[in-house]
Amino acid sequence: MRIVFDIGGSVLVPEDPDVEFIKAIAYELIKISEDHEVAVVVGGGKVARKYIKAAKTFTPNETFKDYIGIHITRANAMLLIAALGEKAYPFVIQDFRKAWEVIQLKKIPIMGGTHPGHTTDAVSALLAEYLQADLLVVVTNVDGVYDSDPRKNPNARKLDRITPEQLVEIAMEAESKAGGSGVVDALAAKFIQRGRIRTYIVGKKDAYHLFDVVRGKHSGTVVEP
């Protein structure tokens, strides 16, 4: 299979780099790459949001602030490259065609953000579409898709299996609320829908066992076209 992994920045670097987690997922990714083609997109997480918030003091320019976030995602990506060692391409990939070339070299391409205006969730969905990936695995700080925000509603129900259309609906509803955000943003959900991409959305606990996740053994949500 060809698999794209979307690793959330808040999972990789919650406050400081989670070194043990980075070691664990690097081990899992190397093991998976022995039998599958693998590409990874890394997010910016809380660190990126802190920098963007600070930048608001100095500039109203949203595109400029997006670029700050992109640089943070690439710093996080470099951490994972270091952990993967020789198995990873040694530089952060910045376009999809290069990611394709790196896969042909039997290396793992690692990406961060690419352009202002969309998140690394969207980058991973577009990359999966471009590569015609068999599977997209989204690792986030929530252990799946819920019918409402589990961080605010203790009665929220996790959805084991949904369609891309349902994912779009849930993501758009989450973003319509003040300060709201879903486990996958609406633009990424629309790309998943457009590309008809089979997607697993899992939490950090499952991510320690990515080898099992790609075989369908996880407690997250399956998005099935």
From Swiss-Prot:
The keyword Oxidoreductase does not apply. GO terms for molecular function: ATP binding; UMP kinase activity. Gene3D superfamilies: Acetylglutamate kinase-like. Keywords: ATP-binding, Cytoplasm, Kinase, Nucleotide-binding, Pyrimidine biosynthesis, Transferase. Its EC number is 2.7.4.22. It catalyses: UMP + ATP = UDP + ADP. CDD domains: AAK_UMPK-PyrH-Pf. Pfam families: AA_kinase. GO terms for biological process: 'de novo' CTP biosynthetic process; UDP biosynthetic process. UMP binds at G44, D66, T114, H115, P116, G117, H118, T119, T120. ATP binds at G9, S10, G45, R49, T140, N141, Y146, D149. It is found in: Cytoplasm. GO terms for cellular component: cytoplasm. Pathway: Pyrimidine metabolism; CTP biosynthesis via de novo pathway; UDP from UMP (UMPK route): step 1/1. SUPFAM superfamilies: Carbamate kinase-like. It is an enzyme of class 2 (transferase). HAMAP family: PyrH_A. Homohexamer. Belongs to the UMP kinase family. Catalyzes the reversible phosphorylation of UMP to UDP. This is Uridylate kinase.
